[in-house]
């Protein structure tokens, strides 16, 4: 089992790292008390090989030796990788002032500045025990995400799942769509009596639509649009991209166009999915 432990000062980006780890398939637990770590790993044994926990100052042992002892007593076969995130006092003060969140060490008579300084003193020994110390003072969330991926995977590439989905406007638009294309202006097989009972998955319908210049041109234009902007969407650290294609009933045109786009991108580095909402119960 691989265990990633994320510690560090409050406001330095631990939650960002946990989100990255979750995207990479890790089972993540936020603010886990270290004495419960053995129990957690035992419970997860056999169900997952990737576990990540974050630990804040309230859950850290007061003595350095106790901290090392708990890490040394991990279950046999556990591969530990540890991160410590830090930022300058000035940056942390600015971040907390902007978000107006309460610092974990804030007390009625303790100022934010004092809480930040006190946490630095408490965690300084821990910062010297980890595998990777990362100063996030000058990193945005995307820079930090890329840095974590590079450490764990050896590259910053992230698998983008592209979901092409057909639908019928008469049944409502999909709320999860990132891009939506209306193909109701294209020639409609519904008006061909022999094609009406079929769908865009059937060869006669596909043949009919493939012979329509406007259909081919529109598919080509969508392909070029997506190919142009996909690199920019990847740099925005997306995990999923949903492209919705809609016609009137979601039976013919939208299904065909969705299938063609999925085939065009099938050999890309992305994971491609095709779904037909109005055919899903068939």
Swiss-Prot record:
Annotated keywords: ATP-binding, GTP-binding, Nucleotide-binding
Residue positions binding ATP: 8-15
Highest taxon above the source species: Bacteria
NCBIfam families assigned to the protein according to its UniProt record, in alphabetical order: PRK05416.1
Binding site for GTP: 56-59
Family recorded in the similarity comment: Belongs to the RapZ-like family.
Known role: Displays ATPase and GTPase activities.
Name by which UniProt lists this protein: Nucleotide-binding protein in ptsN-ptsO intergenic region
GO molecular function terms listed in the Swiss-Prot or TrEMBL record: ATP binding; GTP binding
SUPFAM superfamilies per the UniProt record, alphabetical: P-loop containing nucleoside triphosphate hydrolases (SSF52540)
HAMAP family linked: RapZ_like (MF_00636)
Signal peptide: none
Pfam family, one: RapZ-like_N
């Amino acid at each position: 089992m691989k265990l990633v432990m994320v510690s560090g000062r409050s406001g330095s980006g631990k939650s960002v790292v946990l989100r990255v780890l979750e995207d990479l398939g890790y089972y993540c637990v936020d603010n886990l008390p270290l004495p419960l770590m053995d129990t957690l790993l035992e419970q997860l044994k056999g169900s997952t090989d990737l576990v990540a926990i974050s630990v804040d100052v309230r859950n850290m042992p007061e003595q350095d030796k106790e901290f090392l002892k708990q890490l040394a007593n991990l279950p046999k076969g556990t591969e530990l990788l540890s991160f410590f995130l830090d930022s300058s006092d000035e940056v942390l003060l600015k971040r907390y002032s902007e978000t107006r969140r309460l610092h974990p060490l804030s007390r009625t008579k303790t100022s934010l500045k004092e809480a930040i300084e006190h946490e630095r003193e408490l965690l300084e020994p821990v910062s010297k025990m980890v595998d990777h110390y990362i100063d996030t003072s000058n990193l945005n969330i995307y820079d930090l995400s890329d840095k974590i991926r590079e450490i764990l995977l050896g590259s910053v590439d992230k698998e983008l799942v592209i979901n092409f989905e057909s639908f019928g406007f008469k049944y409502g638009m999909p709320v999860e769509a990132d891009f939506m294309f209306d193909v109701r202006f294209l020639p409609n097989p519904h008006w061909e009596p022999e094609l009406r009972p079929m769908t865009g998955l059937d060869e006669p319908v596909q043949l009919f639509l493939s012979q329509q210049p406007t259909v081919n041109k529109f598919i080509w234009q969508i392909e070029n649009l997506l190919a142009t902007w996909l690199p920019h969407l990847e740099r925005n650290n997306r995990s999923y991209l949903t492209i919705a294609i809609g016609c009137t009933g979601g039976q013919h045109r939208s299904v065909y166009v969705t299938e063609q786009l999925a085939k065009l991108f099938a050999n890309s580095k992305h994971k491609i999915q095709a779904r037909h909402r109005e055919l899903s119960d068939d």
